[in-house]
């Protein structure tokens, strides 16, 4: 590894498993003090143990990142331990897959809370000290679903469209205070979340077979593919990249 985040404090929401877990391990290997904020405390603790066993530095805070008090308490805990946050990876998210006319207001509100409000809360909590310490990098997990609609995913697609613009708007407002904010936009990825999405879509008659995915993006992506893209956006290697959407989809959205 090349110490691209050496000495930096990095919060990763949803950093216990899947793409978030891969990012937690990679960021730590690149020298960051990794703070995982995740509602799955057991999984977060296991990821922290694996990072420490590999010689990295990490800790975790158990919190529902859609709840303001929980977010503020977790961020305060991170700052008390490590100081100002230099990197924020807003990764926590989930999905609702069902025919639109069967969805409910409760599902709409819940999904927006997890996928969008969480980024608002995390970013708002981290920014004051990040700015005061000289700036930093924020990365938000969007999706190909922000620009490529999928049947049965109206609620999910809408949240990712919001994330797309959230990242860009934060970049524009805070650029002159040395804050960068970009979005990483995965295609179909081999995680529990991604494989559940594929299974549920297939059960509803949407063609996301191996052949269909191969035609759209060559192969199914791996969590590490997304983690490496997030690392680039988090690190100083992307110091002149701000308000961008980096698609990790092997050309899915280019076709």
Give, region by region, the residue ranges found by the protein language model.
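Short, small/polar-rich loop/turn modules that mediate ligand/substrate recognition or access, typified
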Residues: 89, 175, 180, 241-243
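Active-site loop immediately N-terminal to the catalytic Tyr-X3-Lys motif
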Residues: 98-101, 148-154, 176-177, 218, ...
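Substrate-binding pocket helix/loop in short-chain dehydrogenase/reductase
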Residues: 99-100, 107-109, 211
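C-terminal substrate-recognition "lid" of short-chain dehydrogenase/reductases
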Residues: 120, 135, 219-248, 253
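Active-site helix of classical SDR
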Residues: 123, 159, 167
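Alpha-helical segment proximal to the catalytic Tyr-Lys
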Residues: 128, 172-176, 239
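Residue(s) in the substrate-gating loop at a strand-loop-helix junction
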Residues: 143
């Amino acid at each position: 590894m090349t110490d691209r985040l050496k000495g930096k404090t990095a919060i990763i929401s949803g950093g216990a498993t899947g793409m978030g877990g891969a990012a937690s391990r990679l960021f730590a290997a690149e020298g960051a003090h990794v703070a995982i904020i995740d509602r799955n405390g057991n999984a977060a603790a296991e990821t922290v143990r694996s990072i420490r066993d590999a010689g990295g530095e990490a800790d975790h805070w158990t919190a529902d990142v859609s709840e303001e008090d929980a977010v503020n308490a977790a961020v305060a805990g991170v700052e008390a331990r490590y100081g100002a946050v230099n990197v924020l990876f807003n990764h926590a998210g989930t999905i609702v897959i069902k025919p639109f006319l069967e969805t409910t207001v409760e599902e709409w509100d819940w999904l927006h809370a997890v996928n969008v409000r969480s980024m608002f809360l995390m970013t708002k909590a981290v920014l004051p000290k990040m700015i005061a310490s000289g700036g930093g990098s924020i990365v938000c997990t969007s999706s190909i679903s922000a620009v490529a609609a999928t049947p049965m995913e109206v609620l999910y697609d809408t949240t990712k469209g919001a994330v797309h613009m959230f990242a860009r708007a934060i970049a524009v407002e805070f650029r002159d205070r040395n804050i960068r904010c970009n979005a990483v936009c995965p295609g179909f990825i081999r995680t529990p979340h991604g494989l559940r999405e594929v299974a549920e879509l297939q059960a509803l008659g949407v063609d996301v077979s191996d052949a269909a995915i191969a035609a759209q993006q060559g192969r199914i992506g791996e969590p590490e593919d997304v983690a490496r893209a997030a690392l680039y956006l988090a690190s100083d290697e992307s110091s002149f990249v701000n308000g961008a959407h980096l698609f990790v989809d092997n050309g899915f959205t280019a076709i």
